[in-house]
Amino acid sequence: MFPFGPHSPGGDETAGAEEPPPLGGPAAASRPPSPAPRPASPQRGADAASPPPVAGSPRLPGGPAVSPAERAGEFAAPGALELSAATASASQAKLSPSSSPRRRSRPDWRAGGRSRQGLGAGLGGPGARLFGWLRERSLGRGLFVDPARDNFRTMTNLYGSIHPADSVYLSTRTHGAVFNLEYSPDGSVLTVACEQTEVLLFDPISSKHIKTLSEAHEDCVNNIRFLDNRLFATCSDDTTIALWDLRKLNTKVCTLHGHTSWVKNIEYDTNTRLLVTSGFDGNVIIWDTNRCTEDGCPHKKFFHTRFLMRMRLTPDCSKMLISTSSGYLLILHELDLTKSLEVGSYPILRARRTTSSSDLTTTSSSSGSRVSGSPCHHNDSNSTEKHMSRASQREGVSPRNSLEVLTPEVPGERDRGNCITSLQLHPKGWATLLRCSSNTDDQEWTCVYEFQEGAPVRPVSPRCSLRLTHYIEEANVGRGYIKELCFSPDGRMISSPHGYGIRLLGFDKQCSELVDCLPKEASPLRVIRSLYSHNDVVLTTKFSPTHCQIASGCLSGRVSLYQPKF
């Protein structure tokens, strides 16, 4: 270590008259001294000005390509990063053969706090890159934050390169229309719900047929839901739900009876292991799979509403969303599946029409808020609002299973009613995806609604829980059939049935995440890729949870698998 200079805070005037010889053995020690005369040492207390930099000062042989000032800025402690340009120039002059050796001045360590302000901006090279990387990491971005997220980003880019000619067809055409597709959580099995009472199982990687569950039900199979990597449930128009085990597909695990009409979809709460089903009888039924036997599972009716179409749980199971054919979207906040909701037992937080701007129109009365919308909605609204709980009138209270009644705004349908036929949720719970059709079946729309922050706490609030952010008009074909659309596993893309094929939609051209490109007003979804390979109307589509693959099924029974070719 070099001794302190005579004018450093702890230096001695007599100490360090000359620097020690450089390391490197006798050859380095025998180096002749510089011919330049040694300048006189300044007086104590005088300001010693550094000499101007020596132009064209050569580097030491075999030394690094960077200057000493850059090395000091890269490796020194934070307090030493404020070495002045004159000090760096003096170091260069010292290393020059034509310059005389000088004492190295000690940096002011008390200036470390001031130097930190310019760490990222004042320095170039590795220092700026380092602090730029730290900043991106603190914001949750970059390659080292979430590898799975960046893998999905790569997969999103690959989806844009898929061509219809790359599709693979699965042999399902003898089993009727395809109503639903579902991958196992590990992506190893693809299940197909068919119109003619059967369920087909395929290996999505090799496209080979695994098993056909003949007469899985006595009527159309509508929906399939995996509970884990081996157990899955199916529901049917025969009003039953069946549980299956991939390890033993010869027989059902059990059959569940409880609905009185067509059962349309299945949800599963992984926290409580409760199965949730809904049907056209208007009932939402809870099944306790923890106490399942060959005769069935204990069950109870959880909720009832008229014109029920679809029911979904958010990924954290804190909300339940229910869509109706009369254009309403019901949201149960602070969900508690252990408590049955009889008519009149749940508080209604508000009944409003969602919008993408601030021109919300509501009228309130002493009995609660009333929806301002199409006249065809009033009967359903009156039957719901007349049972409003007084508990929700207290400001600041958001009780368990609080009901919110919304009329989602649909572009072009402001003055007409609409039917919400399909309902999906963002994988991270940020938004809900709806497929809406007009009551006259002359228009179809795909709409994305962002969840607003915070749960509603008052019966009438100036802000709804949902806000329309993106939309796109769909092909008005296959009237009377429900088209099931879906999010990609990372939520960056949407796969939507469109005529005889599917469209991959994004929130912007770069397939950014929703939170990174939220518009101030509702804007159209961007078409990333259109894939048309069917000869009939496509009814359902699904992303693989683990591979870069999309499946679609059509009315004539064909299943297509899309994946990029390398």
UniProtKB/Swiss-Prot annotation:
Modified sites of kind Phosphoserine: 50, 57, 67, 96, 99-100, 356
PROSITE patterns: WD_REPEATS_1 (PS00678), WD_REPEATS_2 (PS50082), WD_REPEATS_REGION (PS50294)
Location of region: Disordered: 1-72, 87-123, 354-413
Ranges annotated as biased composition (Basic and acidic residues): 377-388
Pathway in which this enzyme or protein is active: Protein modification; protein ubiquitination
UniProt GO cellular component terms: Cul4-RING E3 ubiquitin ligase complex
Any one Gene Ontology BP term: protein ubiquitination
WD repeats: 173-212, 216-254, 258-297, 303-342, 415-455, 477-515, 533-566
Keyword annotations of the record: Methylation, Phosphoprotein, Repeat, Ubl conjugation pathway, WD repeat
InterPro entries assigned to the protein according to its UniProt record, in alphabetical order: DCA10, WD40/YVTN_repeat-like_dom_sf, WD40_repeat_dom_sf, WD40_rpt
Record field: compositional bias (Low complexity): 87-100, 354-374
Repeat recorded as keyword: yes
Pfam families in the record: WD40
Modified residues (Omega-N-methylarginine): 141
Known partners and oligomeric status: Interacts with DDB1.
Similarity remark: Belongs to the WD repeat DCAF10 family.
Record's function text: May function as a substrate receptor for CUL4-DDB1 E3 ubiquitin-protein ligase complex.
Protein name listed in UniProt: DDB1- and CUL4-associated factor 10
